[in-house]
Amino acid sequence: MLIVPKKCDIITKYTYFCERIGFEMKKELSKLYDPKEVEDKIYKFWMDNDCFKAHRDPDKKPYTIVIPPPNITGQLHMGHALDETLQDILVRWKRMSGYAALWLPGTDHAAIATEAKIVAAMAEEGLTKEGIGREKFMERAWAWKEKFGGRIVEQLKKLGCSCDWSRERFTMDEGCNKAVREVFVNLYNKGLIYRGERIINWCPHCKTSISDAEVNYEDQAGHFWHLRYPLSDGSGYIELATTRPETLLGDTAVAVHPDDERYKDMIGKTVVLPLVHREIPIVADTYVEMDFGTGVVKITPAHDPNDFEVGLRHNLPVINVMTDDAKIVADYPKYAGMDRYDARKAIVADLEAEGALIKVEDHAHNVGTCYRCGTTVEPKVSTQWFVKMEPLAGPAIEAVKTGKTKFVPERFDKIYYHWLENIKDWCISRQVWWGHQIPAFYCDECGEMVVTKENGAVCPKCGKPMRQDEDTLDTWFSSALWPFSTLGWPENTEDLKYFYPTNTLVTGYDIIFFWVIRMMFSGLEHMGEVPFDTVLIHGLVRDAQGRKMSKSLGNGVDPLEEIEKYGADALRFMLATGNAPGNDMRYIEDKVKASRNFANKLWNASRFIMMNLPEDFKLGGIPANLNVEDKWIISKFNRLAKEVNENLEAFELGVAVAKLYDFIWDVYCDWYIELTKPRIAAGGETAETAQAVLVWVMQGMLKLLHPFMPYITEEIWSAVSDSDVPCILSTFPTYDEKLDFAVEEAQFEKIIAAIRGIRNRRAEMNVPPSKKAALHIETAEAEIFEQGRLFFERLASAAEIVIADKVDMPDAVTVVTDCARIFIPMDELVDKEKELARLNKEKAAVQKDIDFSSNKLNNAGFVAKAPAQQVEAEKAKLAKAQEKMAKIEQSIAALMK
């Protein structure tokens, strides 16, 4: 059944609420805009009136975004703020554009991270999870989730996120749990999930397996220890080098390349393992690089993934020498219980004492660390659950190649393809308790194993109760189902039929593998369709110096603190302005301040309009008797609406917001409002027309700006609009051919260009606005400039205006535009000698700046050693000084005429 609210219901609720909390139509706006007074009130209004709620409507196209579910352990950071701001902009735009827009929210259970926090809290009470048992631990975990899991949601609301909170989901709620079991069983029955002994990545701190994608690699300074392994027959020794002497205890072979002439005669012989004195074979394997090190490799199948593969090929035994917390096992009494790094020192000392250590070399190498805690990962042979990836990767590659899903920017296709074309089976089992317990059951009586969606399985062979697998699933397993599990799958719900596939996924490039790829193959496998049409990739938010924000650097910025200082709209506007798809951006607080100043500019413009409207003012659309400047602003707004829609359609959100900024600040506030002031002061019909156009354009601007700055636009909308519909539910402006006054717009731009040129020249000559100047305008388009007489007088401080097709004033200062030359006699305005003295003094100071920057940039040492950012800043400084010098010289030349 389709549920569509009646528009009158929304209007009635809106009007009632406006009256109840003091939203008065055409109310007087306060002198200053205070976000703290407005934001909570506005958000409550939206929530109380179900403004975010999505309804299935056969007359509307659906537009769906699923939120990348933040961890319940999470605190809103700048990455979240950027991610959610971009999504909210798109959803608000589509909602206003007539779509049934659903932004589906939720949170992720974050298995390892959440369990770590709960275990730490228990440790303060002197408790362990093993000590209280799984059932009691899970009770504590759910209690922790209820207490702390909603913090991130409240923080998203502070940002202004217009999610449909009535549909909020959690990756471990009943519906998601049902979907997870369904998928696991389906994939297992197809042979795409299997259990086996493989070498996996083990985190000794988290004490769980992690997938290849969850390992971060970093260069670390280390050593090559060159060791002597004596031949068993006493005929000599073989030399090899290793970065991990502590794993020597588990060596089961040494390997050489079959084509290496140095060692051909040794293949098949045995060596004596130092310290352990166990005989191990010399095997030939093409894995060995002849020209690296000594061309000999020790093989430890239990502690290196490549060695594990060599071991399989040569049927070598697997000897594990470490416990789950990376300590030496009891089989080696001298080192038993030692941490791996302490054992390394002890073993190296013993090797030296035994005469097996030849030399030690410095060596930098890649070390894998756990993405959660940063601990060095230990390769470990273990029985785990895996997803067979190759059969799932093919359709996911094809879906992007055929355009069913596109990446924005397109260059991220390559990263996507690279991951899928080189993918390995996914280790999905984790040795933690908080998460989806694997639906596999074992019979201790007869050894039978059953994979089933049902709880409390009974052995089908012997009828005895079965115990469930202790392990849980990788957090990303449930996240991979997010686009359809949140809409009711595996049930074929009405929501699923209407809102799936979703439209846009907004996410960072750092989780393309973790999440995007896994959602792609999950959607294709279980729904038969891609999960989303478009993947919009954004970069990281870095600090002002371009560094990644991190706890270690202490350079993180709390979005909530910035919202407290400047308001949510200012933060959102800055994030949108600095965003270009796929690129990192820098967080610069001055830009947030500039965004707040922009909000204040808009507020003040609105106050001016409201203060100058008559009590009986009624907006009846655009009047018929428009002046040229009215047609100019209407036409420019009409084109702005067209371009903003095009930019949003192309995901150029930063471009759209820059155009809005320029139009509102420059075109509307600095020009059109100033142009209307004399008309409003004069009163009569021309004032009424100006007021009507001011309000009409303001309303349109508020609607265009609303997705970016929702709070202030909604507040002003309640004052300047006669509509009973709130701004969030109003209609987004689009291009209207009837409002395209291209001819008048072009004509008036010529007047604007002339006024701007006159103002600039007067400023360069240090002429204050209070001094009136004569203007002699030479132009072939006199009719256009005749229309601008009033504007030249008011905005260009013109006293006398002469318009002619020919002007001869060689001693006057000249302003040149594309259709006119404007002569300004300066004799009565400027004391030439005094002004020349000032300009020459300024010229000398600027020359010093030019010389300083030039000398710096001509210094090869500075250019080579200084940070690139500093060099570029110096170049920009030089260019600015040179530009200033050119203007000074131009002013001097004008005065010397």
Regions found by a protein language model. Name each.
Residues 55-118, 171, 180, 240-243, ...:
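N-terminal catalytic cores of NTP/NDP-binding nucleotidyl/phosphoryl-transfer enzymes
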Residues 81, 238-256, 372, 378, ...:
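Conserved phosphate/anionic-ligand binding catalytic regions in large, soluble enzymes, centered on
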